Regions:
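Hydrophobic alpha-helical and helix-loop surface patches within well-folded domains
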Residues: 1, 171, 200-445, 451
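Hydrophobic helix-coil surface modules that form long, contiguous segments used
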Residues: 97-106, 113-267, 296
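Solvent-exposed beta-hairpin/edge-strand motifs
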Residues: 1-39, 93, 129, 133-134, ...
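Glycine/proline-rich low-complexity spacer/linker segments in large multi-domain proteins
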Residues: 1-12, 70-124, 520-536
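Short, solvent-exposed loop/turn and secondary-structure capping segments
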Residues: 44, 75-84, 137-140, 181-184, ...
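Short, hydrophobic/aromatic-enriched beta-strand segments in well-ordered soluble domains
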Residues: 61-75, 124-132, 169-175, 512-520
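Non-catalytic accessory/interaction domains
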Residues: 135, 145, 207, 345, ...
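A surface-exposed beta-strand-loop module
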Residues: 12-87, 163, 493-509, 519-520
Length: 536
């Protein structure tokens, strides 16, 4: 892992690496690399190995590479390592030399700094020889499950007794772009089956409360998987493992390493199976397509789970429901003056703060706000179409945008341009209200630099309400009515005009309140001027 100068260090790293002894650091040393038995010349550039082939590989041809490398497992600091804070002996991620991705833009060779990655799908056959007392969870299916036992052949079976000092574990995984595993002699194993998927929960049991919390992870996974399959597209792999290990939470194909049994992290890391493991966007260049889409899915899954458990949202929860935290994070970043465009590569933000908010919060809001623009139901159809068209194909932002435009029938280039490529903000306000010839006239003003369509709610003194909708001319159309609620559609608001006047057939005296964007899905940086309450 490379370490450079940053104005705000990751608190989990800081200067800890520099304090490791020679026996505690991690390294990988390439001993040899052969192609079809012929040694190949290599050069090492930091964390990148360049191979100048002695013979070109023709299109459609097949070759076999054999690599011998030596590695030392570091004391766990980030992602991979031994003896983490929770006492897990080995958290084995980023443990082998991994192929760089080659796509339609060429080779992707960023230095690895323990953040995002972009990988090549392939089939893995991994054999691990380890002390017989260790228990392992990881990517893939255990091929020799009968010889191992420990719940892998049948739930509840113990680890098989063997006479040798080491035990052999053989995992196989198809169509994945990475492989992770963790090992500890004190691991416990919970197994559930749901809709053809084996759900493994592997953890260290400290006490009965800890065991109950991990049992809750298994129950929650069992509850939400059918919803995830229906909402985001069917999970295509035979198993998924929630494994205690690493630090925080980190996603891998068919598995995640978790610090603890918190369900928010559980749902987030599992959602990465869709928005990274199956779709495989370049999260180094477009982390919002990975972390942001995943955070949106996490919010939706968490809301579903809570509804199944009988929880109801508090009246004090800020709108939009399920995603309010993302909006708070984004608004704080805007106020800080540290905002950067979402086109910034993940490793090249000026601050970790801006990276985190852009990748997670603003990326999440990209989808909640897309629901505001095209309707939530159309947005959900877009996400399923995106899954169907682009899984296992490495989509770029333009590919997602094309799907969104095709499904919605609306022009959305402007949305990506403003929200992704700039730091311009949204701010609409109620300018003035008056009566003329028995009709009321409302003037709205665009104060921010980013244009949007407008949802408007009128409340009258008799407690009745009206929903009004002002399309944005840039979309060349409008969204359908939402939730079957009738509405009044007005002429388009031309994006070049800072003000808009709306006429409605009610006397001013009958009006009680006017509210812009009552669902709060629009990321208006100053909602204080969105509501006008009339005191008669």
């Amino acid at each position: 892992m490379l370490v450079g100068n940053r104005p705000d260090w990751d608190s989990r790293v800081k200067d800890r690496i520099s304090k490791l002894s020679p026996t505690e650091i991690g390294y990988q040393k390439i001993i040899s690399l052969k192609m079809n038995g012929v040694e190949q010349p290599v050069k090492v550039y930091g964390t990148i190995l360049e191979v100048n082939l002695t013979k070109p590989i023709a299109p459609g041809a097949k070759v076999t590479f054999d690599m011998v490398f030596e590695a030392q497992v570091p004391v766990q600091i980030r992602r991979s390592g031994r003896d983490n804070a929770e006492g897990v002996r080995y958290s084995m991620s980023q443990w082998y030399p991994k192929m760089c991705e080659y796509d339609n833009t060429g080779w992707h060779t960023p230095q690895y700094v323990a953040r995002e990655f972009y990988g090549v799908w392939g089939d893995y056959d991994v054999t691990i020889h380890i002390d017989k007392n260790y228990k392992i969870g990881g990517t893939g299916v255990l091929k020799n499950a009968v010889a191992i036992g420990w719940g892998y052949d049948k739930p509840g079976t113990p680890l098989k007794n063997i006479s040798t000092a080491r035990r052999t574990w053989n995992f196989v995984a198809q169509n994945v772009h990475d492989f992770v595993w963790a090992a500890d002699p004190d691991f416990e194993h919970i197994v559930r089956n749901r809709e053809g998927v084996v759900l493994n929960v592997i953890y260290k049991a400290k006490d009965s409360a800890t065991t109950a919390a991990w049992e809750n992870v298994a129950e929650a996974a069992y509850i939400v998987l059918p919803y995830m399959n229906k909402r985001f597209g069917k999970y295509p792999y035979p198993q998924y493992s929630f494994i205690q290990g690493g630090d925080g939470g980190m996603e891998y194909p068919m598995a995640t390493l978790l610090k603890g049994p918190g369900l928010g992290t559980v749902f987030h890391e599992w959602m990465h199976s869709w928005y990274q493991m199956m779709l495989g966007s370049n999260e180094i260049e477009h982390p919002w397509m990975d972390e942001g889409f995943t955070s949106w899915g996490e919010g939706e899954v968490n809301a579903y789970y809570r509804s199944q458990k009988g929880f109801t949202p508090s009246a004090r929860v800020m709108l939009p429901l399920n995603h309010a935290g993302a909006y708070r994070g984004y608004f704080s970043l805007v106020k800080s003056g540290l905002a950067e465009p979402m086109t910034t590569f993940s490793d090249h933000y000026n601050t970790n703060y801006a990276y985190s908010v852009n990748a997670y919060s603003k990326g999440e809001m990209y989808l909640t706000q897309l629901g505001y623009i095209v309707s939530d139901s159309v947005r959900d159809a877009i996400m399923l179409a995106y899954y169907d068209k682009w899984r296992f194909k490495h989509p770029a932002p333009s590919d997602f945008l094309k799907v969104a435009k095709d499904v919605s029938g609306l022009q959305l280039n402007w949305y990506n341009e403003y929200w992704i490529n700039t730091t311009k903000t949204i701010d609409y306000g109620i300018d003035s209200l008056w009566e003329e010839n028995g009709k009321s006239i409302l003037r709205l003003r665009r104060i921010g630099d980013m244009p949007m369509p407008i949802d408007l709610k009128l409340t009258f003194k008799d407690s009745t309400t009206e929903t009004h909708y002002i399309p944005l001319d840039l979309t060349l159309g409008g969204k359908p009515a939402e939730d079957g609620e009738p509405r009044i559609v007005h002429p388009d608001w031309n994006w070049t005009n800072p003000t808009y006047e709306m006429v409605f057939d009610k006397k001013l005296f009958d009006l009680k309140a006017v509210e812009i964007d009552p669902t709060r899905r629009m990321a208006d940086v100053d909602p204080n001027n969105n509501v006008l309450e009339l005191k008669w």
